[in-house]
């Protein structure tokens, strides 16, 4: 059968407020044994069985008396202890109530003390916040550059009037409130700098900077002297160059008319060189082809030898005529160059440069004719005939 909600609440209340009394339970236990033994004697159900605890013997009766007496004493001491505890609790409660009655007169004083304590705690909290702000500012000052704003009166008090005026003129102290009257003590000036270094460190830095500036000044003066000396030398060189350019401009104006003829002759020389190169390339190509043909037609060489000799004689005559014409052209160009050499030294060099390729071309032409003759009758005849046809 399930318990109701009321029964459950009663059980919980008993468990919460109940207290296990061990001496009382032990005393009830021994009383239960004595009651059971006397009930058995009265009802006549007492047994002489040794296995039962309720056996009526002198020893059991003496043990029951002793146990009952001891447990009674234990229970009595427990009751006395609880009685003393209750009395102490009542005394304490009475004293507490008496004190509460006496505190009613002192309650306003306690409330005023409480309010004062709260006020002091608030002041301590504000002081703590101010210390934190100062610590943050000190950390900022130690880390790098920061700004500091103070009135002019305080600046003059710390630094002096003359130094403050000097710093204001150098724009080191900058005015924060431009609307105030000028040169008044209420003006606020701001400074932005690194305050993490001490006076001794700043003095050493200032001394090292002064020594560096002096060294730089000496180096600049020495370099300035060198630059002035070099400038004089460069000025003289420039004047010499200008004079030389004026002289050359006059010579170029005189030789301007001769340059036109020289350009025309140089064009003719270039055309002659190109023509000779084409002839030489044709001769080389024909020479290679004829060498291949000679290897294929060695067995026919004996039958055609007489006819080729006659043609070779005719070709040699034509080649000699061409060489004579080239030599005549070279002599005429050499005479013209000699005449120009008397007029101007520079034009002489240019014509000399042009004459040299002609001589080289003549030498190369002679070498090619000589090599073509060494290759054999067929090759030389064919190359000579092709060169003659090209010249014509």
Curated annotation (Swiss-Prot):
GO CC, any one term: nucleoplasmic THO complex
One GO MF term: nucleic acid binding
Biased composition (Polar residues): 331-344, 377-392
Alphabetical GO biological process terms: DNA recombination; mRNA export from nucleus; mRNA processing; transcription elongation by RNA polymerase II
Entry-linked Pfam families: THOC7 (PF05615)
Subunit and partners: Component of the THO complex, which is composed of HPR1, MFT1, THO2 and THP2. Together with SUB2, TEX1 and YRA1, THO forms the transcription/export (TREX) complex. THO associates with DNA and RNA in vitro.
Compartment list: Nucleus
Composition skew (Acidic residues), residue ranges: 258-271, 290-330, 345-367
Other information: Present with 5910 molecules/cell in log phase SD medium.
Presence of the UniProt keyword Transcription in the record: yes
Protein name per Swiss-Prot or TrEMBL: THO complex subunit MFT1
Positions carrying Phosphoserine: 266
UniProt keywords, alphabetically: Nucleus, Phosphoprotein, Transcription, Transcription regulation
Region of interest called Disordered, as start-end residue ranges on this chain: 258-392
Encoding gene per record: MFT1
InterPro entries: THOC7/Mft1
Function comment: Component the THO subcomplex of the TREX complex, which operates in coupling transcription elongation to mRNA export. The THO complex is recruited to transcribed genes and moves along the gene with the elongating polymerase during transcription. THO is important for stabilizing nascent RNA in the RNA polymerase II elongation complex by preventing formation of DNA:RNA hybrids behind the elongating polymerase.
Domain of life: Eukaryota
């Amino acid at each position: 059968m399930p318990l109701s909600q009321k029964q459950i609440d009663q059980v919980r209340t008993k468990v919460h407020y109940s207290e296990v009394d061990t001496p009382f339970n032990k005393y009830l236990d021994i009383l239960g044994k004595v009651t059971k033994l006397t009930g058995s004697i009265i009802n006549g159900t007492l047994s002489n069985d040794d296995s039962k605890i309720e056996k009526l013997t002198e020893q059991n009766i003496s043990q029951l008396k002793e146990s009952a007496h001891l447990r009674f004493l234990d229970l009595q001491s427990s009751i006395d202890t609880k009685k003393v505890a209750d009395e102490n609790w009542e005394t304490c409660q009475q004293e507490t109530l008496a004190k509460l009655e006496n505190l009613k007169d002192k309650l306003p004083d306690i409330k005023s003390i409480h309010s004062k304590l709260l006020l002091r705690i608030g002041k301590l909290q504000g002081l703590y916040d101010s210390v934190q702000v100062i610590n943050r500012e000190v950390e900022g000052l130690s880390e790098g550059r920061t700004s500091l704003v103070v009135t002019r009166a305080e600046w003059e008090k710390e630094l002096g009037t003359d130094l403050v005026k000097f710093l204001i003129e150098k724009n080191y102290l900058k005015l924060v409130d431009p609307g105030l009257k000028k040169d008044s003590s209420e003006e606020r000036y701001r400074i932005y700098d690194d305050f993490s270094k001490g006076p001794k460190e700043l003095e050493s830095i200032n001394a090292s900077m002064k020594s560096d500036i002096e060294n730089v000044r000496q180096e600049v003066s020495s370099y300035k002297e060198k630059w002035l000396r070099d400038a004089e030398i460069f000025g003289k060189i420039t004047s010499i160059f200008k004079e030389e350019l004026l002289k050359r401009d006059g010579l170029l104006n005189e030789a301007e008319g001769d340059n036109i003829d020289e350009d025309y002759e140089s064009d003719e020389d270039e055309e002659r060189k190109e023509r000779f190169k084409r002839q030489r390339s044709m001769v080389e190509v024909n020479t290679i082809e004829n060498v291949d043909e000679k290897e294929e037609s060695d067995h026919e060489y004996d039958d055609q030898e007489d006819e080729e000799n006659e043609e070779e004689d005719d070709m040699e005559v034509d080649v000699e005529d061409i060489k004579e014409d080239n030599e005549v052209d070279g002599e005429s160009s050499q005479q013209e160059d000699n005449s120009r050499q008397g007029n101007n030294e520079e034009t002489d060099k240019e014509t000399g440069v042009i004459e040299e390729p002609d001589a080289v071309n003549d030498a190369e032409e002679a070498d090619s004719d000589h090599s073509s003759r060494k290759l054999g009758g067929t090759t030389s005849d064919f190359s000579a005939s092709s060169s003659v046809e090209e010249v014509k």
